[in-house]
């Protein structure tokens, strides 16, 4: 775990590789319980079978907005326990977004005690008074904790920080060392790097890596929170092989590989159901049921209640058919 003072030096080398954002497997009536055995298997699969170097816990893909404080704490504890039993060096990233700063503080303090390496705070989701309000929120947490902090600049919050607002947070709070820029605005990430060059940036628009931004130092070598375990199996490591080429600056080979392997087409086929609900097409969602159905197609356990908790809806049959067909075309399943 990095403390606040050393966070930026630590982040430059520690935040590297594929960081898997874990889903939450539900069970019981209406998904009121968590299938802890299934969750443990998922962690072991990501860290052990796939050998990925980072985890991203209790964020949007995990449906944090539907979880109790107690559930979120336990999900982190189990992830730390299972991951470190396999690889003591695995980086555990805990997302502590909450409506109230006091709840975020409770989760951040718990993450610090439970062995998380870094905490990410998503841009506050309600009644946010712009960049100044976000800065106040971060300060409230930073003044009361001693752990590396990251920003999660997600459009699902309803407000996206500008590069200037994010850079001001970095300037004011020494613990802030990384950001997941989830709004697919590469021009803002480029400007943010100019304003705060010490910040490790993951730009979710992965085309910037093909443009040489990693070698230029604009973005970092870590996929801070993705679902890499849904894009490969231990037998077909297309996702890891592609990113290994990128990280080694073999960009032409990487692009050729993504095309020839079917990875590019697979990502296009899958992404629509992961992040878009047809009944609200202008909203960037994390459709838990879609991620979990994809996991089930690969044979991963998703609990006896494989849907999202409210207020999300059940995944339609069309989505299931298209997701399964995408996996078949990509060659990760036979049928």
Q: What spans do the regions from the language model cover?
A:
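Long, contiguous hydrophobic alpha-helical segments, chiefly transmembrane helices and signal peptides
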Residues: 20-21, 46, 56, 61-64, ...
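Conserved active-site and cofactor/substrate-binding residues in soluble primary-metabolism enzymes
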Residues: 34-37, 41, 70, 74, ...
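Hydrophobic transmembrane alpha-helix bundles
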Residues: 53-54, 91-102, 124-137, 157-166, ...
């Amino acid at each position: 775990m990095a403390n606040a003072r050393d966070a930026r030096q630590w982040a430059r080398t520690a935040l590297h590789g594929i960081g898997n954002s874990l889903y939450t497997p539900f069970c019981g009536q209406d998904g009121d319980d968590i299938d802890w055995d299934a969750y443990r298997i998922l962690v072991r699969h990501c860290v052990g079978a796939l050998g990925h170097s980072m985890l991203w816990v209790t964020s949007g893909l995990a449906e944090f907005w539907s979880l109790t404080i107690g559930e979120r704490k336990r999900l982190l504890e189990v992830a730390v326990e299972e991951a470190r039993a396999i690889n003591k060096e695995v980086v555990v990233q805990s997302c502590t977004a909450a409506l109230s700063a006091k709840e975020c503080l409770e989760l951040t303090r718990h993450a610090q005690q439970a062995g998380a390496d870094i905490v990410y705070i998503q841009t506050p989701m309600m009644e946010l008074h712009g960049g100044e309000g976000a800065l106040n929120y971060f300060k409230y947490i930073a003044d009361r904790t001693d752990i590396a902090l990251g920003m999660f600049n997600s459009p699902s919050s309803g407000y996206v920080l500008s590069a200037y607002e994010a850079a001001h947070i970095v300037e004011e709070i020494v613990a802030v060392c990384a950001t997941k820029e989830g709004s697919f605005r590469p021009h803002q990430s480029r400007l943010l790097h100019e304003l705060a060059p010490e910040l490790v940036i993951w730009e979710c628009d992965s085309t910037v890596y093909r443009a040489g931004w990693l070698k230029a130092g604009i973005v970092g070598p870590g996929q801070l929170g993705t679902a890499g375990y849904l894009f490969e199996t231990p037998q077909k490591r297309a996702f890891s092989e592609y990113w290994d080429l990128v990280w080694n600056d073999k960009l032409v080979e990487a692009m050729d590989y993504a095309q020839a392997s079917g990875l590019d087409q697979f990502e296009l086929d899958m992404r629509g159901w992961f992040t878009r609900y047809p009944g609200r097409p202008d909203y960037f969602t994390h459709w838990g049921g879609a991620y979990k159905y994809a996991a089930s197609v690969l044979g991963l356990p998703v609990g006896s209640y494989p849907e999202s908790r409210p207020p999300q809806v059940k995944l339609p049959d069309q989505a299931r058919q298209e997701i399964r067909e995408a996996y078949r075309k990509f060659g990760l399943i036979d049928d």
